[in-house]
């Protein structure tokens, strides 16, 4: 998830870096970067659903792979529409000055993400009683924040609100995982220390008096 999110941020930065440049490198860089921003964004949705399914399964609960397959299908469909938009410019247009402009159907590109996040939200709601509070908050933030950002992105132009939200949410999940692992290691160390104490105590009690 973090790797895919990093790829999205890198492509978004490249799109801003090369916009307006009239040389050959700028011409191709802006077009490739904007295409990758859309495509990697959809791939990120599918990768996260895969992660969520595996995350729930790792807790010992049976969960079908069907939601992940549906998400990959939706992501593939969305990418196909991005390819089509390169010819009919329904999502965006890059003008003669090598500047990106939204088009009338840009909102459609965002609805795919909103719908995919709702699927993830339904999974989280269904298995909410089987996850800890910290896990629910971390995963829930990754679902809720991008949904809010997608709505805002439709109306806010010039600021990558969506990618900032996904980055912050991914960091929340990463921090949650690190905290959980630290707590697990601390509990294991405490249990190991407790298992050694009775043995040492028995040796002390059975030692003959001098």
Model-derived regions: residue spans:
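Membrane-interface helix-boundary motifs at transmembrane edges
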Residues: 1, 24, 53-67, 124-135
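Hydrophobic alpha-helical transmembrane segments of multi-pass membrane proteins
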Residues: 1-53, 70-88, 139-154
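Juxtamembrane loop-transmembrane helix junctions in multi-pass integral membrane proteins
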Residues: 18-35, 59-66, 97-104, 130, ...
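Alpha-helical transmembrane segments of polytopic membrane proteins
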Residues: 31-42, 101-114, 163-170
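Alpha-helical transmembrane segments in multipass membrane proteins, preferentially the mid-helix core
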Residues: 47-51, 110-131
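Extracellular-loop-to-transmembrane junctions of the mid-late helices
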Residues: 77-122, 153-155, 159
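Interfacial "cap-and-anchor" motif at the non-cytosolic start of specific transmembrane alpha-helices
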Residues: 123-189
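PAS/LOV and related PAS-like sensory modules
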Residues: 191-210
């Amino acid at each position: 998830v973090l790797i895919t999110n990093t790829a999205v941020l890198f492509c978004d930065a490249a799109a801003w870096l090369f916009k307006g440049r009239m040389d050959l490198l700028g011409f191709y860089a802006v077009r490739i970067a904007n295409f990758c921003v859309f495509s990697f964004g959809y791939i990120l949705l599918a990768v996260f659903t895969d992660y969520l399914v595996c995350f729930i399964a790792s807790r010992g609960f049976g969960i079908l792979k069907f939601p992940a397959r549906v998400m990959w299908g939706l992501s593939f469909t969305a990418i196909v529409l991005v390819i089509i938009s390169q010819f009919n410019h329904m999502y965006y247009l890059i003008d003669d000055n090598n500047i990106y402009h939204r088009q009338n159907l840009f909102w459609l590109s965002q609805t795919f993400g909103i719908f995919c996040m709702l699927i993830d939200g339904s999974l989280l709601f269904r298995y909410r009683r089987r996850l800890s509070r910290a896990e629910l908050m971390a995963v829930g933030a990754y679902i809720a924040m991008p949904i809010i950002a997608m709505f805002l992105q439709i109306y806010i132009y010039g600021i990558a609100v969506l990618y900032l939200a996904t980055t912050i949410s991914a960091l929340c999940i990463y921090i949650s995982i690190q905290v959980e692992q630290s707590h697990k290691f601390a509990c294991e160390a405490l249990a190991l220390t407790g298992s050694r104490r009775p043995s040492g105590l028995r040796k002390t009690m059975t030692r003959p008096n001098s």
